[in-house]
């Protein structure tokens, strides 16, 4: 196998976040899969976690109309404080037992409602100014319980590498995954989320290597800021304005994809055992700007980012599928 499935965070593609605009933009680009995060189904912009049953039903109908399916739930699970201490941030603390019983179950409900097997999540905010390494044991315990909850419902929890969280590098995320030791927890590579912390291209590649034993899928965005000079301890919102397409940044995507091409059969076998047929490259471009709980690209920016990704895939020889006339003919036959 040397092919991947292209997907994307659809909310980045629409100025209004309206569902039909999101799906129209992605369908025009050629995508058939998307990750759901924020959406307006007629009652204002909402996170997927707080959608009403009627809104879910409307989205299910729109999926059929636009030929879209959900690759993952872009949940905010794990983007809360690990400890109930004041650290100068606005991050919330929720007692873990309550979080596991309520928020995690809602995320699982959404995955079942949208017939997908994957939940995206995070590794908790340690107190600002403390070392993330000191919190790996507690995070691993909590994420282990989240993985068990997902596994009971036939789902897989994907842990995204991101700044300011305990799992802010590939090495830390790999250590967490090793401690959890549950196939229901996999890791998500995101090169830009490490370049923004001051890692070089060579260092990002090393972080990708560290994640391979636990890797589940990849988020695709890139980052380039000539003013970066060494490691950044805490990333602020002002840093989120230097995202670029995958063929223009410092995340070593070409080198990573060269390796991924040979690793895909192993990775596909791993995810197939979890009921996931194929390896997703999930576009999350942020090319008009990013933030703590998402980013924005616009329909033009999303298309630019998608074409940038495809150029890198073409160069290294990894196959992918964009909508064809045959797909259109098949859709017409189904709607007849």
Where are these regions (language model features)?
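N-terminal substrate-binding region of glycoside hydrolase catalytic domains
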Residues: 9-11, 25, 29-53, 74
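Active-site beta-loop-alpha junctions enriched in small/polar residues
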Residues: 9-13, 37-41, 75-78, 124-126, ...
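Active-site acidic/histidine proton-transfer and metal-coordination neighborhood
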Residues: 20, 24-25, 65, 81-187, ...
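Surface-exposed, active-site-proximal loop segments in enzymatic domains
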Residues: 40-53, 77-101, 123-135, 233-244, ...
